[in-house]
């Protein structure tokens, strides 16, 4: 049942340094595409684009 979970856990990776900084949950029905958010990257020391990784 966990494989077809509506709200799976996803990891967010920085697009600049490629570090996986955040783990969050998303609703697959509302957001079927990959999630892209601007978040703070502690490795870069600034706000950068973070994208969902698989």
Curated annotation (Swiss-Prot):
GO terms for molecular function: structural constituent of ribosome. Disulfide bonds: none annotated. It holds the Pfam family Ribosomal_L33. Keywords: Ribonucleoprotein, Ribosomal protein. InterPro entries: Ribosomal_bL33 (IPR001705), Ribosomal_bL33_CS (IPR018264), Ribosomal_bL33_sf (IPR038584), Ribosomal_zn-bd (IPR011332). Belongs to the bacterial ribosomal protein bL33 family. This is Large ribosomal subunit protein bL33. It comes from Frankia alni (strain DSM 45986 / CECT 9034 / ACN14a). The gene is rpmG.
């Amino acid at each position: 049942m966990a494989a077809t979970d509506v709200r799976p856990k996803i990891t967010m990776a920085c697009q600049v340094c490629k570090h996986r900084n955040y783990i969050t949950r998303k609703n697959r029905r509302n957001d079927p595409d990959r999630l892209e958010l601007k978040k703070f990257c502690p490795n870069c020391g600034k706000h950068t684009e973070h994208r969902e990784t698989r």
